[in-house]
Amino acid sequence: MTFKKILVGSALLLTTIFNNNVYAKDKKLELINVSYDPTRELYVEYNKLFTKYWKDKKGQDVVIQQSHGGSGKQARSVIDGLKADIVTLALAYDIDAIAEKASLLSPEWQKKLPHNSSPYTSTIVFLVKKGNPKHIKDWNDLVKTDVSVITPNPKTSGGARWNYLAAWAYALEHNNKDEEKAKEFIGKLYKNVKILDTGARGSTVTFTQRGIGDVLIAWENEALLSLHQPGGDKFEIVNPSLSVLAEPPVAVIDKNAAKKGTTEIAKAYLEQLYSKDAQEIIAKFYYRPSDLEVAKKYANTFPKIKLVDINYFGGWKQAQKKHFDDNGLFDQIYK
């Protein structure tokens, strides 16, 4: 299935599994999973696994609706009233914002599931044209004046914020932690960005389908998936010398689920992401599984890259305020 086919129609993907032997006493359950941009294929597959699991366990049919878009934009939709039962977003700050601004879940939500409520991780890499004609090897090559860079907008996209922070970390590490020099580096990089799509998938389409740009800064899973799409042989991946440990978290939106009577199934939906079968699906779609046995099985898929985590930037609250809030560093360098 191509990206174009996936993008046709509404951003709201309805995945429905029916069973002819429906118990009359059981009301069909409905869940809304509000997710970030490039998880579409992952959750199409996982939803099939989960609906079968729930049918076998409870004898109930489940309808799961998927909403995808830039993580920040998705979080705002939930804050503004989208009745999500669960969120599976790109970064913890976006779920923190739902807890803080709408009080729809506990501020301690991240302690409820293993690995800081992140059943999978990823990192940030470069996707370039086959043969790497611009000889892109590392972040410093992205600031050359003849290189056109594609990356989403960090104001709306979680992946874009990870992209930015990976570049910021590289700049700090290569300039003795001098923030003024890092700011100058980031300014040069974003001067080479001509299009800021609202989400990671939009940027992938801009680069792989529309043929715009010399390099795509991308989620590792998105870059690997691109290589396995029709036309994927036109591209190759470059792993930078330094990147970030991206931890996309998941959470039940407690107040919405309680009102809808879906708390039990919403919790089960997220808990099952840690099951062996789900972790296999996660690896199949090129996310780094949290289960150590499954991760070992797929070790050759994921190269070893030097990574820094969000604590390198002082945590998400500090990183968001410093870099991405109104009048933050991003607004200062990208006008």
Which residues fall in each region the model found?
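Short beta-strand->loop
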Residues: 34-36, 128-130, 148-175, 190-193, ...
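C-terminal segment of classical bacterial N-terminal signal peptides
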Residues: 15-23
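A bilobed periplasmic-binding-protein/Venus flytrap-type ligand-binding module shared by bacterial periplasmic
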Residues: 124-132, 247-264, 281-285
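Ligand-binding pocket segment of bilobal, Venus flytrap-like solute-binding proteins
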Residues: 174-241
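Bacterial N-terminal signal peptides that target proteins for export
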Residues: 1-8
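N-terminal segment of the mature folded domain
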Residues: 25-156, 299, 334
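Extracellular/periplasmic juxtamembrane helices and adjacent flexible linkers that interface
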Residues: 257-335
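Short helix-loop capping/hinge motifs at secondary-structure junctions, enriched
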Residues: 131-137, 156, 169-177, 256-264
